[in-house]
Structures are given as C-alpha cells and as structure tokens.
Swiss-Prot record:
Misc: The inhibitory concentration 50% (IC50) is 0.8 ng/ml for transformed cells and 10 ng/ml for normal cells.
Keyword Nucleus on entry: no
Annotated keywords: Apoptosis, Disulfide bond, Glycoprotein, Hydrolase, Toxin
Name of the protein in its database record: Aralin A chain
Catalysed reaction equations from the record: Endohydrolysis of the N-glycosidic bond at one specific adenosine on the 28S rRNA
Entry keyword annotation includes Hydrolase: yes
Subunit structure: Disulfide-linked dimer of A and B chains.
EC nos: 3.2.2.22
Post-translational modification: Glycosylated.
Protein family according to the UniProt entry: Belongs to the ribosome-inactivating protein family. Type 2 RIP subfamily.
GO molecular function terms attached to this record: rRNA N-glycosylase activity; toxin activity
Amino acid sequence: ANFPTVSLNTVGITRQIPQDFMNAV
C-alpha cells in the first residue's frame, strides 16, 4: 500500500496495521 507523506512519520505505527486494512483506506 502507498503511504501518504503524513503516514511516513508514523510508519512505525502503521507497520502494526494489516496491509489489507491499509488497502481499504
């Protein structure tokens, strides 16, 4: 999934989120 610039700052947190969920977003 492509991460917005803002998510890059919280990539440590987003890594814990399933990729399937990120794809839904």
